[in-house]
């Protein structure tokens, strides 16, 4: 907002014309005029040619179990076609699980620690559950927040910038969600992936020695 960016969430695009977008939200229809329009509509699975297999569908893709097995014997699926997470790093891990299962190696796919990154300036990254999801599910949780400006390294490298580290924990004090706004969020999010995958607790994170000075120190400091 400080940079003049305006967000319209929970909205549906109805029509696009030269220099104009018509969209609707809970309050009705609206129009936005602009000299440029960037269309980012995502992807959808290509299922052409596999109709004869009669695979059980899931959303717009193919249903798989935690071993990436489909409803048909000796058929596995991985990547965007599973309709879980349309991200390259998710597809890589799904492919590993599928191949390991084919070879009889015990492996299982988990989706509780899939990182997502917006490569903007400043960067935004998140891993695990969000506070909104926990509220909707009625689960007990605790929020830990700290401004990125508590990190001297962040202040030195992002002059005049600000950011936020937000960590969510469950009633067992396990890390279940971690979210960053500010550079270098895309690099720091790997720490969140490890913490959530390993089901680390607040006490365990606090015992980790982070190098100083680094922006990643903010993770431990947020939990102090």
For each of these PLM feature ranges, what is it?
Residues 103, 120-130, 135-224:
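Flexible, glycine-rich terminal cap/loop adjacent to redox cofactors
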Residues 31-103:
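FAD-site-proximal beta/loop scaffold in flavoenzymes
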Residues 6-8, 76, 142-144:
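General small-molecule cofactor/ligand-binding pocket signal
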Residues 1-11, 126-133:
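N-terminal glycine-rich dinucleotide-binding loop that anchors FAD/FMN and/or NAD(P) in oxidoreductases
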